[in-house]
């Protein structure tokens, strides 16, 4: 019987598969990875991330206030003139027509802009879980820039506060922050907007804590301070570091002058209280008027301001320049 011939290659043992060895990890590489992961974990903790977010909110709020002030100045130059004594027709027509346009926008386009920005921000904190519609930010920007720039006796602080709160609310919702952080983020933005408007971060922090939050919170104080400071730094980068009011150097010549300052403080507080009482008295009466008067109320106020401005142009606008020149 002939033997079956088996090919030599058939009985050759198969080559062992190549085993890939993982690259050697040195002790230095392990330390670098550990430090990187520890740094990321440190930064990504929500409380620390919230502080970084406060700086971002301050920057965006500061930019918004810069644009807001430039819009007011552009509107004033366009509708009135660069001087404080523009021509007679412009003094009367500019605030009147601007009031009519503001009424139309507030009724049909931006209904959320009506009322006090401080009260709306407080409602957002305690009722709406920090929610401020971004359309309110746009509406406040447009209507208030038009109203103040046309000469109506309004200040940019209140709309700046609400715009800052709205910007913070938008950023917080976009990042899906927790409900607790969303409630706190509106006052953070409010402080940033107010600080940039006043160029005074400390005053803005104290105002927001007292008026918007109502209580001292150690957890939110750091974020509020960071937002206020970063917004002022941003604003000063574009508009300069000049204070809102320049106070000349003075010294007390005699102790008797302190009595005059006490009287001045009492008189100023009394005048402010009287103005507040007038506002409280007239507001419900105006709200009781027929709804169609909403279209003409801002125009009527603008007409009254324009008529007064013919003789006293200092009453038109925010009035900062007049106070600074006093």
State where each predicted segment sits.
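Alpha-helical transmembrane segments and immediately membrane-proximal extracytoplasmic
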Residues: 1-326
């Amino acid at each position: 019987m002939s033997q079956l011939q088996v090919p030599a290659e058939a009985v050759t043992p198969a080559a062992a598969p190549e085993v890939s060895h993982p690259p050697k990890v040195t002790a230095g590489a392990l330390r670098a990875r550990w430090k990187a992961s520890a740094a990321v974990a440190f930064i990504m903790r929500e409380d620390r991330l919230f502080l970084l977010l406060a700086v971002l909110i301050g920057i965006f709020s500061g930019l918004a206030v810069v644009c807001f002030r430039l819009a007011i100045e552009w509107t004033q130059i366009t509708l009135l003139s660069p001087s404080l004594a523009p021509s007679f027709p412009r003094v009367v027509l500019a605030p009147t027509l601007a009031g009519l346009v503001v009424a139309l926008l507030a009724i049909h386009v931006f209904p959320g802009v009506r009322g006090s920005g401080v009260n709306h921000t407080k409602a957002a904190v305690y009722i709406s879980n920090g929610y401020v519609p971004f359309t309110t930010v746009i509406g406040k920007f447009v209507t208030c820039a038009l109203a103040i720039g046309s000469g109506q006796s309004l200040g940019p602080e209140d709309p700046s506060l609400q715009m800052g709160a709205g910007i913070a609310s938008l950023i917080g919702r976009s990042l899906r922050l927790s409900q607790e952080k969303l409630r706190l983020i509106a006052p953070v933005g409010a402080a940033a907007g107010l600080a940039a408007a006043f160029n005074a971060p400390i005053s803005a922090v104290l105002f927001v804590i007292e008026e918007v939050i109502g209580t001292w919170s150690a957890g939110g104080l750091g974020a509020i301070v960071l937002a206020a400071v970063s917004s002022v730094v941003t604003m000063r980068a574009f508009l300069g570091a000049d204070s809102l009011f320049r106070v000349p150097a003075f010294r007390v010549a005699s102790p008797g002058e302190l009595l005059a300052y006490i009287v001045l403080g009492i008189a100023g507080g009394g005048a402010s209280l009287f103005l507040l009482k007038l506002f409280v008295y007239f507001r419900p009466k105006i709200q009781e008027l027929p709804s169609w008067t909403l279209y003409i109320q801002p125009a009527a106020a603008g007409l009254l301001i324009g008529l007064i401005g013919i003789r006293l142009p200092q009453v038109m606008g925010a009035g900062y320049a007049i106070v600074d020149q006093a």
